[in-house]
Amino acid sequence: MARKCYITGRQAKSGNKRSHAMNKTKRRWGANVQKVRILVDGKPKRVYVSARALKSGKVERV
């Protein structure tokens, strides 16, 4: 299972890390996703959900 939000689709983004000399190195910013149990089609399922979706009430924990 990918570390991607089941509700909003948020996932890791990529970009460059820049040193003081402005050298660039590829890096990734991970999304704040938590593994939680939610109801999917009336059955509990353990999925990754972003913290933003949890805080906004888009999903109900079981």
From Swiss-Prot:
GO terms for molecular function: structural constituent of ribosome. InterPro entries: Bacterial_rp_bL28 (IPR050096), Ribosomal_bL28 (IPR026569), Ribosomal_bL28/bL31-like_sf (IPR034704), Ribosomal_bL28_bact-type (IPR001383), Ribosomal_bL28_sf (IPR037147). One of its GO terms (biological process) is translation. Signal peptide: none annotated. The keyword DNA-binding does not apply. It comes from the Bacteria. GO terms for cellular component: ribonucleoprotein complex; ribosome. Transmembrane segments: none annotated. Gene3D superfamilies: Ribosomal protein L28/L24 (2.30.170.40). Keywords: Ribonucleoprotein, Ribosomal protein. It holds the Pfam family Ribosomal_L28. Belongs to the bacterial ribosomal protein bL28 family. NCBIfam families: L28 (TIGR00009). This is Large ribosomal subunit protein bL28.
